[in-house]
């Protein structure tokens, strides 16, 4: 068995996180909102949110948000100016959630968020981090499309959570999606440090240390257990 509960035999916590960014290039663009939940297991075996952050981050002096980002997220230059913090403050808040470790970092399309996160953490020492990409899992569970909004609908969570292109809403939604995935099939642990990528485009951005990257196409239906990406990797 490799279900959600078993992950807490290996990790002190899951840190579910999401970013909103000023663009798509981690080298040129910045995180403008960073949200995260630290999820721990109680002695009774229940999951609880042990810590939470939702932080806006100021842009470098003289920079402004592209209009399409404002439209998509609702985050404005004025909001970042009045409510945003310096990047170092955001990092300090984030590091409080990843310690004590070890922790498992969880995100939907984790490759994107992890690349931006590493840029934010440059010069800091977060320690060793493992990764779980719910997008890779979801590609084995449902046919295209595979956005978080699609997972919310697939697991009938739309009355419980919202997907608003705001980081804090997305991490709360992903927590519920993760639990629904676990109820559906007990193999989440087999996806740790395994990122699927579209073979048509290759891996986007830098490769995250410790992560195994494997081509993963689109399925027309839920993948049988023996045909999931981890199962195929185990037979190599």
Model feature map: region roles:
Residues 168-169:
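Acidic donor-binding loop at a coil-to-helix junction in glycosyltransferase catalytic cores
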